[in-house]
Amino acid sequence: MKNKMFILICLLVGIAFNSCNSNKTISSKEQLDTVWNDKVQDSFYGLVLGNTIPLAVIVKTLENQGFYYGRQYSSGENLCFRAQQSRYFTFGGLTWEMLNIERHGDVLNSVCFMNSSIDKASSLGIYNNIKAAVEAKYSPSTIITTDTTVYARTYYLGRNRVCATLSCFRYETIGRKIMIGTSLVYWTKKGKKAANDEL
């Protein structure tokens, strides 16, 4: 009897050990194979993710880098910038159309580089080119999603609490036109408090 109990306990410990060491997180909608990078970039044009930066400083800093602030497209937390001299600008050796900044209060939370097209095939080609460039620097974590508006998505997770998400997705413009976006978003959890589950 003791021998059977010992075997049962060993079997349960083995199952628990195996399930705890899995790198996959599974839900009904998505599966994520997690890979962590030591650090993901957190500074862009002199602005650091997670830092408290007033709106006027963000606007002046980016204007000095050749961008203009699209006030008519921005809100208090979502700031839209475009290149002053042409339709495109470069970052990381790649060409982009749009730069969007997200903040909560005065804390800089994310920086989004984005391109837009009406053609899914060319957007997926752009996605794959960006993916190859980013993966020369970071190891990916790929997510499988059932969201029909997302054609491809890859995460780059940093132990420094900064992550990047590369996505190719469908969206509708204000004028009700369907577009395909390709975005590279750097975002942080710095300064965010864990959710409190107390009532």
Show which residues each predicted segment covers.
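Intrinsically disordered, low-complexity serine/threonine-rich segments
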Residues: 9, 22-25
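Sec-dependent N-terminal signal peptides
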Residues: 5-14
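C-terminal motif of bacterial Sec signal peptides marking the signal peptidase cleavage site
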Residues: 16-19
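N-terminal secretory signal peptides that target proteins for export/translocation
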Residues: 1-2
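Compositionally biased P/S/T/G-rich terminal and signal peptide-adjacent segments
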Residues: 24-36, 82-107
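Non-cytosolic coordination micro-motifs
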Residues: 24-78, 113-199
